[in-house]
Amino acid sequence: PNTVIYNCSECHKRFRSKSGFVKHQKTHTGETPFVCFVCEQRFVCHSALIGHQRIHTGEKPFSCTECGKCFSRRSHLNSHHKTHTGEKSFLCFACGKCFASRSHLTAHHRTH
């Protein structure tokens, strides 16, 4: 397939979408045009601001179809869903043990 790849000239990361590439470039320029009206924290993209504002509002629009638990971010729901499926896709290359989240794998790495 003829997939266009966008290359960052600063750090050489590669992106398949132009929007992801443009958002990434702001990490190098320091541009943070989106500001939280409550705490004035700044963000590179609008979607990050929206997710952050849910901390202040308490809104949790993403609910688990298995148990009904609600989350403020879709990524948190996706991580939670693994507790129901048993999926463990993060592998420790040192010992072969698998984990459901990158953070659990990172914590495990400290034991080696």
UniProtKB/Swiss-Prot annotation:
Q: Zinc finger regions typed C2H2-type: which residues?
A: 6-28, 34-56, 62-84, 90-112
Instruction: Name where it mostly resides.
Output: nucleus
Alphabetically sorted, this entry's keywords are: DNA-binding, Metal-binding, Nucleus, Repeat, Transcription, Transcription regulation, Zinc, Zinc-finger
Which SMART domains does the entry mention?
ZnF_C2H2
Q: Name one GO biological process term.
A: regulation of transcription by RNA polymerase II
Keyword Transcription regulation present in the record's keywords: the answer is yes
Q: Where in the cell is it found?
A: Nucleus
What is an example of a Pfam family matching this protein? Answer: zf-C2H2
Q: Which domain of life is it from?
A: Eukaryota
Q: Which family does it belong to?
A: Belongs to the krueppel C2H2-type zinc-finger protein family.
- What role does this protein play? May be involved in transcriptional regulation.
What protein name applies here?
Answer: Gastrula zinc finger protein XlCGF16.1
